[in-house]
């Protein structure tokens, strides 16, 4: 069911995403579709599992991989100057460990907007 007149805005905040993951699982159970969705940081990462209609996917990422050194670690920082292992997060996870349904994501009838900030220029 398309929920007209309501947009979703998802904040960042790392582990706060676990709450959002549960909310999106409920939205999927009720088959709710929102026409406009805005995500920032972790909120943007979490929303894609909802848009691809993959219940439990975000929860599994958080429960099974956030503590993995490939996901976040000092060794990542020393190697790439980022705590996050983006190759692991954006390639290994969605392509192999927890496959992402790109086709279902593309078919989502609503629009996704993602807020970003350049770390140098703001």
Which stretches of residues belong to each language-model region?
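Patatin-like phospholipase
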Residues: 1-40, 48-122
């Amino acid at each position: 069911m398309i929920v007209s007149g309501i947009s979703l805005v998802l904040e960042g905040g790392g582990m706060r995403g676990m709450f959002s993951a549960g909310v999106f699982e409920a939205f999927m159970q009720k088959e709710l579709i929102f026409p406009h969705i805005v995500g920032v940081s972790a909120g943007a990462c979490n929303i894609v599992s909802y848009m691809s209609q993959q219940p439990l996917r975000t929860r599994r990422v958080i429960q099974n991989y956030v503590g993995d050194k490939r996901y976040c670690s000092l060794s990542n920082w020393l190697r790439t100057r980022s705590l996050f292992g983006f190759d692991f997060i954006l390639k290994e996870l969605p392509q192999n460990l927890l496959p992402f349904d790109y086709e279902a994501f593309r078919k989502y009838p609503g629009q996704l907007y993602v807020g970003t900030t350049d770390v140098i220029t703001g």
